[in-house]
Amino acid sequence: MQDPNEDTEWNEILRDFGILPPKEEPKDEIEEMVLRLQKEAMVKPYEKMTLAELKEAEDEFDDEDMKAIEIYREKRLQEWKALKKKQKFGELREISGNQYVNEVTNAEKDVWVIIHLYRSSIPLCLLVNQHLSLLARKFPETKFVKAIANSCIEHYHDNCLPTIFVYKNGQIEGKFIGIIECGGINLKLEELEWKLAEVGAIQTDLEENPKKAIVDVMVSSIRNTSIYGDSDSSNSDSEDTK
């Protein structure tokens, strides 16, 4: 097959009639390198430095550079503070009942707080704590805490455990009370992540409810059982009429 980029009279005719696309121009590597170097030259050296490096190199810049450096340093400092604020949690912390108001209800403004009321003798509570520990590391901008149920609510019934409350600005935005609402005894990490994301407490990268696949299989199984059951019943009725 003839190369469409080949320099032939026939190819030129085909290009003139629009049958062949225009010939690809070879990239000029030297031109690309020059453009890249020009772009790099426009970047001030201090824009590549860390805050510590800027401090060490202060004597090497003139007054004009120093003004720009101060602006740049302040920008970097604010970015660093914002990052530290966003990542100030990162673990599932144990609190007591008398800390509930300060740690949960009166938590920092606009901070999502997830609290798990548990009892260590209940297996699902231990599983939920394991999952929440992993989610706390994955979503450090959200506050995750746990507390023994009776230390927060006296005589709290075991049938209500595990209990997960989701707070923001002192208001309960979501709650999961008991085994069923929390996801069942075989609760998967992704399922709990999805539940908390639906409330808004975390920003998940899951694209769909992981529980949906299980539900779809169950529905399909029930539907098939119903179809086969109707078929067997029909066959039985047919045989009876004979």
From Swiss-Prot:
Main location: endoplasmic reticulum
A GO biological-process term: acrosome assembly
Cellular-component GO terms for this entry: cytoplasm; endoplasmic reticulum
Protein name as catalogued: Phosducin-like protein 2
Organism per entry: Bos taurus (Bovine)
Pfam families xref list: Phosducin
Top-level taxon in the UniProt lineage: Eukaryota
Known function: Essential for male fertility, spermiogenesis and acrosome formation.
Residues covered by the Phosducin domain: 34-201
InterPro entries: Phosducin-like_chap/apop_reg, Phosducin_thioredoxin-like_dom, Thioredoxin-like_sf
Oligomeric and partner information: Interacts with the CCT chaperonin complex and actin.
Thioredoxin fold as annotated region, ranges: 89-242
Keywords for the protein's UniProt record, in alphabetical order: Differentiation, Endoplasmic reticulum, Spermatogenesis
SUPFAM superfamilies in UniProt: Thioredoxin-like (SSF52833)
Protein localization: Endoplasmic reticulum
Family classification: Belongs to the phosducin family.
